[in-house]
């Protein structure tokens, strides 16, 4: 139980940390102050550090420990070079994030061995990108409270990207839910949609409504 919890935490923390920097594409340095980059790059380093500590403390495979450590070292180097800089290359930040994505894919396939690797990677990237997008949009929204005349287009682009990811996730969830079958107490096989219309499936229907829709 503890091992599975650690896997979930590492999976979530690492996925968030490696996908978060890609949202910088919606906030170019020319339109926002360096403090925004400092804070968010530092946040990624902190979350990535937590993933590394958990990986090491729970004695996961050394390849994962070294992989996360290598990515984190690269990210911290990029953070050092970009700190308070007037010329920040989003390409460089994205390269470090791409390296992290490769590490994340290897980790995801290893801790979720049962199933199609492509589906695992797709689901993981979409889910973690949504989490990263929500936090990024929240921080960006708070930035508007402290910075005068910050272009609203930055938040609009971020919100549009997040909405796009949410639509993809919703469609994917509905497709997966449609393929689910349930055998009721009478031995009758029902589709998930049929099951939630029964009295026994009422609470599942509530969960679907709030969780998917």
Give a label for each model feature.
Residues 117-123, 127, 153:
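Non-transmembrane, amphipathic alpha-helical segments
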Residues 3-109, 124-143, 160-178, 182, ...:
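Hydrophobic cores of alpha-helical transmembrane segments in multi-pass integral membrane proteins
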Residues 33, 117-120, 187:
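Alpha-helix capping and helix-coil boundary motifs
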């Amino acid at each position: 139980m503890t091992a599975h919890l650690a896997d979930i935490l590492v999976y979530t923390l690492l996925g968030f940390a490696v996908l978060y920097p890609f949202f910088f594409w919606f906030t170019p340095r020319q339109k926002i102050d360096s403090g925004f980059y400092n804070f968010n790059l530092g946040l990624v380093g902190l979350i990535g550090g937590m993933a590394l500590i958990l990986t090491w403390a729970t004695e996961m495979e050394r390849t994962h420990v070294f992989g996360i450590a290598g990515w984190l070292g690269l990210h911290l180097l990029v953070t050092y070079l970009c700190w308070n800089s007037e010329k920040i290359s989003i390409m460089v930040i994205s390269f470090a994030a791409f390296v992290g994505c490769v590490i994340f894919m290897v980790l995801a396939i290893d801790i979720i061995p049962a199933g199609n690797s492509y589906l695992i990677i797709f689901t993981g990237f979409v889910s973690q990108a949504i989490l990263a997008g929500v936090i990024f949009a929240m921080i960006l929204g708070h930035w508007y409270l402290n910075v005068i005349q910050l272009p609203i287009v930055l938040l609009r682009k971020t919100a549009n990207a997040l909405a796009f990811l949410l639509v993809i996730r919703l469609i994917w969830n509905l497709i997966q839910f449609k393929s689910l079958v349930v055998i009721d107490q009478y031995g009758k096989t029902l589709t998930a949609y049929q099951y939630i219309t029964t009295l026994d499936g009422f609470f599942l229907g509530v969960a679907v409504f709030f969780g998917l829709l």
